[in-house]
Amino acid sequence: MKNRKIRVAITHGDTNGIGYEVILRAFEDPMMLDMCTPIIYGSPKAATFHRKALNIETQFTIIKDAEEARDGRVNLLATFDEEVPIEFGKPTEASDHAAKQAVARAKEDMQKHLYDVLVLGPVVPNPNPNREDKALTIMLSDHVRIGLLTNHLPIKEVAQAISIEKIVEKGKIFFNSLKRDFRINNPRIAVLALNPQLGTEEEQIIAPAIEELEKQNIQAFGPYAAEEFFACNNHEQFDGVLAMYDDQGMLPFNSLAPEFGVKLKAGITAICTTTDHGPSFEIAGQGIADATSLRQAIYTAVDMFRHRKDYDEPLANPLPKLYHEKREDGDKARFAMPRAKDIFK
């Protein structure tokens, strides 16, 4: 099966939202099947209901196991037998449960290596997320990559949630993802300040964390006040930006990427992407949902799979070194951005 296309698992999301619409519309373009082989984790009955109600032409083949997936067609894996009542635009316990069942089955198959990458359909965010999540959420577009140090925290709790250790940990994840997933040889990361005016957290936590990253040969710069940083388009000088909390990263991201965006979970073994929007209940069932973000999430996952393969193969069979590598310091002078140790002098 060396010549088979990349297997892309796609969970159907909340069944009362736009999940099925954007998934099926994404594969109305036959060229998508030239790039990958989709395995939709969901409900054949729910998919059929959405396809007919929204007059979508995409056909799919029902399978019971991921091993049955075939290239050149849209494969729909039945993850549960019970019928799910569809109520467009209304979040219900049944629709949320259906979304969770699809994710649970996809995770099981992930452990069995039955597909290559995972794309999560749009769901309602968990109101009680895992605060100890070691992964890093990265928001991607053609213009910017923004990592979020913390997720779904009230602003008053953010200061207590940040630490030198967490910034170093997430900074390393970001750095490694930029190298392996995006094939950037020596990525530069900007770290944002927590406060509009640099203060205690910046001096005692963020700046020391940046210095520690520098000691580990990671090009980290900052801390930068977020509003001024984006207003001056300083993000264009970096390969990634690490924000301290959701809104600090999401607001400028939405401004810089109004058409579409993709979210990536970095720091986990699997390649996992999702859309930058939720179930969009307000437009569900109207046939006007835009599949661009879902399509871009698939593109990103496929590209990452290829990049990781290209990155990992030489490491598996390395050639003997005939020279001594010297870290390039040119970027420091070329961009003339202040270092953390210089800001608080």
Roles of regions detected by a PLM:
Residues 1-345:
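Anion-binding alpha/beta catalytic cores of soluble intermediary-metabolism enzymes, centered on
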